[in-house]
């Protein structure tokens, strides 16, 4: 299949159909045994994994958070980001107000694998991380699956804005 730059493509199918495999192939977690994966006409096997990973942002269904602060977990998408940039990404992901209610704000530690946060809060931190990274290609792997309907609608609006002029799966 082909996804033109700046367009969005929804990949739908039952569990085990290979939806997540597509993102793994894009990231070169493994190479194809047949056929090719091209990004902007270039075979991903001819590019470094680092450059691919810099160009692609993923919001997975099962968010990975580090046993560190909320700020660190958001800024992981762009090391060296300023506090203002981190907070702006958090606002877009609808998590800033929640963070500001915590006793230590952005300095709050999330615990091992983010266990101190709900599924929806972890998901919003992951979305903020990807927004901050500002990649050319977005992969949203059931990115709003852990959110309530109201929050999902708010984040969908933010994701539409972030997806503008980016290739999105």
Predicted regions and their residues:
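ABC-type nucleotide-binding domain
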Residues: 1-169
């Amino acid at each position: 299949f082909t996804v033109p730059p700046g367009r969005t493509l929804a990949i739908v199918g039952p569990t085990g159909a290979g939806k997540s495999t597509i993102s793994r192939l894009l990231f070169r977690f493994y190479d194809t045994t047949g056929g090719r994966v091209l990004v902007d006409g270039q075979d991903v096997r001819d590019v470094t994994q680092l450059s691919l990973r810099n160009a692609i942002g993923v919001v997975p269904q099962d968010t990975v958070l580090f046993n560190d602060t909320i700020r660190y977990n958001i800024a992981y998408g762009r090391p060296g980001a300023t506090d203002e940039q981190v907070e702006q990404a958090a606002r877009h992901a609808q998590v800033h107000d929640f963070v500001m209610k915590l006793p230590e704000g952005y300095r709050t530690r999330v615990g091992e694998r983010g266990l101190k946060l709900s599924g929806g809060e972890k998901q919003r931190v992951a979305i903020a991380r990807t927004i901050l990274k500002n990649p050319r290609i977005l992969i949203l792997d059931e990115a709003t699956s852990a959110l309530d309907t109201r929050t999902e609608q708010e984040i969908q609006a933010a994701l539409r804005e972030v997806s503008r002029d980016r290739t999105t799966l």
